[in-house]
């Protein structure tokens, strides 16, 4: 890469008054991984941009084609438990029928996989449906709980083995009722009274243990001024919860977020990632002829199916009551299949999981309310939900002042053969640090999840650990997904 291409960008950044910062305001990164999924680390960008990545289809993960599942199955959770992937979802063949009609019976179903790609249904023999127990249902006939039961793997230190799995489900009438399990299949009610009340809860309500905040966090459904909203509450013991607080979204427009699907990101658990369903009531996309061709009026007793649409968006949080919506555009679009332009199609499952050495997956419902209803797997590069992107014309990114612990800096990055990345350390005032300047850096021209940055003197940066510094990146035809300081 020609360094002269960067001179103008470098001078503009260095001369900008906003690069001056107080050392006491430094971000304390320690040795953790940071994703470029928001502007948390970024102070200035010139000739580069923060871009949302688009997932690729990994094919069908599961078809909802069993008698106890069907066209309105939903509220899917995928958990990675060691080398086993566990999937939970509501099974319900049809809607719009009486509670005593088997077509409207709701059950909680369980499937599993060893690779996160192909899921199978174990015959568990726990629940009778249609005169047989040969099915994968684990809960049934418990009021509103099986409408939206959402388990999680409790990672709190010291949690009893008998409560390694927890889950909640319910409605505004019942509150959120908690269940526990040792094996993720046999669930028992934790207590008779609900653990959380005061919400609408008529969606998927997600709980997890946050190492970052040292508490359980629950994100649940409420309404605010007629808009489907997300509210949060916390607890240190899972029994006693703080007064709920509505989440804020900064300057983002108020949109119906039907599900939040929020959990701690598995490679950087201080970052919460939500793959939310964005619902557009009364926004009809299908013409009358298209409705007729899809036979939607015959598919299910649900008139709204043809009148509404939905897609998926990205939410992030670093704790507290604020969601960041850096990217307002869709994370997942309905696509060219007309069957996905119906109400409640394109609802993501909760859970982003590792499905390969350089791949992670999310899952999304397709063809909701129709006989072809299925769950699709979508893949990202590991850490690759978003990236700082430079085109062929070089650009720069400057971080805020930070401190770190460690002796090496690694980047999750990708470049073309023509492109690459250079890295410079600066002091808090923006002055390049001798030995770690751009001129000293060995160009990173590669595609790697953890490429170590080196300078003429080597890769050891331990002399800078604990000191307030900035990182300056020069980039050409490259993407920067994440960085990590390694001890």
Regions flagged by a language model, labelled:
Residues 22-487:
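Carbohydrate-active catalytic/glycan-binding domains of CAZyme proteins
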Residues 2, 19-21:
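Intrinsic low-complexity/disordered segments
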Residues 3-7:
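N-terminal export leaders
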Residues 9-18:
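Bacterial N-terminal signal peptides
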